[in-house]
Amino acid sequence: MNYNNECLSMLKLGKKTEYKSTYDPSLLQAVPRYLNRESLGIVKQQPFTVGADIWTLYELSWLNQNGVPQVAIADVIIDSSSSNIIESKSFKLYLNSFNQMRFPSREDVQRRIQSDLSKCAQGDVTVQIYKLSDFAMRSISEFNGECIDNQNICINRYDFTRESLQGIANGEIVEERLVSHLLKSNCLITSQPDWGSIQICYVGKQLDREKLLRYLVSFREHNEFHEQCVERIFCDLMEFAQPQKLTVYARYTRRGGLDINPFRSNFEGIPENLRMVRQ
């Protein structure tokens, strides 16, 4: 990936910014998906047929027609076939610009956000805004599957490497869901840590748990956006394990009132936006 790309140098990430309290859709900034997909060789055709970046917006507020502040939580689903990623700091600044803006209804806010995000992403976006009382009905969930974290192994490499993926898949064909809560990468621009849990669902030759964990831990000093990390993991597993079916789904902890949860699959539909214990 060309980290010196002009569009990346223009991002507000890592720079002092002014917070606006009047609605301004121009605050949204896009990162072209092709920048990372070029390095993976998947610009023209992606190995996943279904994908979405699932966001939860915890800090959403506006004024009603009488000037009374309203607060809500929203789900946003951005199709992975869209041209662009939404840069998270710009998303936060954009949402803050609603704070002193009057809207007739929650539905009007929802339509406005959906329209603005669709234009920025250049693709399909859905937005659902919830009252706090409705969102409170959601219970804390966890990924289904076997957790691979409690292995009695020594690890001393934390820079990204694909070495451990050599010979990762052997034996009979199985259908499994594997989970790790040890995913940690760093922001592409600021190097701030991004913490997440990951679920890998597949049909294929059985994956070696130790090799898989070593590979995931190697992201610990790796600098990429959430969405890019998940696509890299998907592509690497397809290359080295060659499963018949594969899903990679990561849920990251929130920052700035937003959490980002990329989902990529070649056989499953987009899941409901759950909430995990660290979210």
Curated annotation (Swiss-Prot):
GO biological process: queuosine biosynthetic process; tRNA modification
EC numbers: 1.7.1.13
Catalytic activity: 7-aminomethyl-7-carbaguanine + 2 NADP(+) = 7-cyano-7-deazaguanine + 2 NADPH + 3 H(+)
UniProt-annotated binding residues for NADPH: 88-89, 255-256
Enzyme class: oxidoreductase
Name of one Pfam family that matches: QueF
Keyword line: Cytoplasm, NADP, Oxidoreductase, Queuosine biosynthesis
InterPro entries in alphabetical order: GTP-CH-I_C/QueF (IPR043133), NADPH_dep_7-cyano-7-deazaG_red (IPR050084), QueF (IPR029500), QueF_N (IPR029139), QueF_type2 (IPR016428)
Major location category of this protein: cytoplasm
Residues noted as binding substrate in the record, renumbered to the chain: 86-88, 226-227
Compartments reported by the entry: Cytoplasm
Record-linked Gene3D superfamilies: 3.30.1130.10
GO MF annotation terms: preQ1 synthase activity
Protein family (similarity comment): Belongs to the GTP cyclohydrolase I family. QueF type 2 subfamily.
Self-association state and partner proteins as the record states: Homodimer.
HAMAP family the record matches: QueF_type2
Protein name: NADPH-dependent 7-cyano-7-deazaguanine reductase
Gene name linked to the record: queF
